């Protein structure tokens, strides 16, 4: 997925609004994913997946860090997330559809907390960005 110049500007703009709340957004997105798509819990058998658990918050922090890293290196997401892609493809073997599900949950969280900032254009740009991140994370499955 190719991000245009305006997409990149929109993504960087929304991440600047998220700011120090990215970790909370990551945890909330995971909580939403677990509630909406309970089959995703199977990848976390050792986690307490209840809302607000320390393990969900810790993994939410990792999710947020990866998204921030991708946004900070938006011109080369593949290199920025290469190690994470290797981990998910070779060790964790997460079903690729789960990246799309988590991306949609993250988009919902951003919309809830930033309704005025998430214009249709920003929404489309963020969706394209999250799809690009998902594509990078699943590229090494092939």
Curated annotation (Swiss-Prot):
Pfam families, A to Z: Globin
CDD domains cross-referenced by the UniProt entry: Hb-alpha-like
The keyword Metal-binding is annotated on this UniProt entry: yes
UniProt keywords, alphabetically: Heme, Iron, Metal-binding, Oxygen transport, Transport
This protein's name: Hemoglobin subunit alpha-A
Record-level GO cellular component terms: blood microparticle; haptoglobin-hemoglobin complex; hemoglobin complex
Binding site for heme b: 88
Role: Involved in oxygen transport from the lung to the various peripheral tissues.
InterPro entries per record: Globin, Globin-like_sf, Globin/Proto, Hemoglobin_a-typ, Hemoglobin_oxygen_transport, Hemoglobin_pi
Subunit structure: Heterotetramer of two alpha chains and two beta chains.
Similarity comment: family membership: Belongs to the globin family.
Cited PROSITE patterns: GLOBIN
GO terms for MF: haptoglobin binding; heme binding; iron ion binding; organic acid binding; oxygen binding; oxygen carrier activity; peroxidase activity
Tissue-specificity statement: Red blood cells.
Domain Globin: 2-142
Keyword Flavoprotein annotated: no
UniProt binding sites for O2: 59
GO terms under biological process: hydrogen peroxide catabolic process
């Amino acid at each position: 997925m190719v991000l245009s110049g305006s997409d990149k500007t929109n993504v960087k703009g929304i991440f600047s609004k998220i700011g120090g709340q990215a970790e909370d957004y990551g945890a909330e997105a995971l909580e939403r994913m677990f509630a909406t798509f309970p089959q995703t819990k199977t990848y976390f058998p050792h986690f307490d997946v209840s809302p607000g658990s320390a393990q969900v918050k810790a993994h939410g922090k990792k999710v947020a860090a990866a998204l921030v890293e991708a946004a900070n290196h938006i011109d080369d997401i593949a290199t920025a997330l290469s190690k994470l892609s290797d981990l998910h493809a070779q060790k964790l073997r997460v079903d690729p559809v789960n990246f799309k599900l988590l991306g949609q949950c993250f988009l919902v969280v951003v919309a809830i907390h930033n309704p005025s900032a998430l214009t249709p254009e920003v929404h489309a740009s963020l969706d394209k960005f999250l799809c690009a991140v998902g594509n990078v994370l699943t590229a090494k499955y092939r």
